Design a protein with these regions (language model features):
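N-terminal secretory signal peptides that target proteins for export/translocation
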Residues: 1-7
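N-terminal presequence-like segments and the immediate start of the first folded domain
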Residues: 8-85, 89-102, 108-156
């Protein structure tokens, strides 16, 4: 009986310690500070160009616009180039680089422009290429042909 009581007490103590460790780890991860990255590309809109949490940067959808909001002229190629340049601006402002990008979502107004977009994308993004999804969107803000969002992770 004494051994059983001791075993149950030991088990309870171990569980309590493990629970405290789990709660502590969860609190540390949830209490990480969020740092907003705001460039001219947001132009007063109700979102940040990026949010850094810990060693991860979440880049909001970027389009191929200049600081005044004007789309790059010349079709999907120049617009893709300008979009990727805007992503690089957000990355740089947060202390990240294209090599830190691990995931990308591409929104195209016309999926038939996929091959032309891909040529530019392939020439700009370093190897290994990030995971990527490409989606056709019915319409994009500013009548853009492309919008790209990204997630970057800085190696510790």
């Amino acid at each position: 009986m004494k051994n059983t009581l001791l075993t149950k007490t030991s088990q309870l103590c171990i569980c309590a310690v493990m629970l405290a460790m789990t709660i502590g780890a969860a609190q540390r991860s949830f209490s990480q500070e969020r740092k907003a990255i705001n460039l001219a590309t947001a132009r007063g809109l109700p979102f940040s160009d990026g949010i850094v949490v810990g060693n991860t940067l979440y880049v909001a959808g970027q389009e191929g616009t200049d600081d005044a909001g004007k789309l790059a002229a010349g079709g999907i190629g120049p617009e893709t180039t300008a979009t990727l340049e805007n992503i690089q601006k957000v990355l740089k402002a947060a202390g990240f680089d294209l090599k830190d990008v691990v995931s990308v979502t591409v929104y195209l107004a016309d999926i038939h422009e996929f091959p032309d977009m891909n040529k530019v994308y392939k020439s700009v993004m370093p190897d290994p290429k990030p995971a990527r999804a490409t989606i056709q969107a019915a319409a994009l803000v500013n009548n853009a042909r492309i919008e790209i969002s990204a997630i970057a992770v800085k190696q510790k």
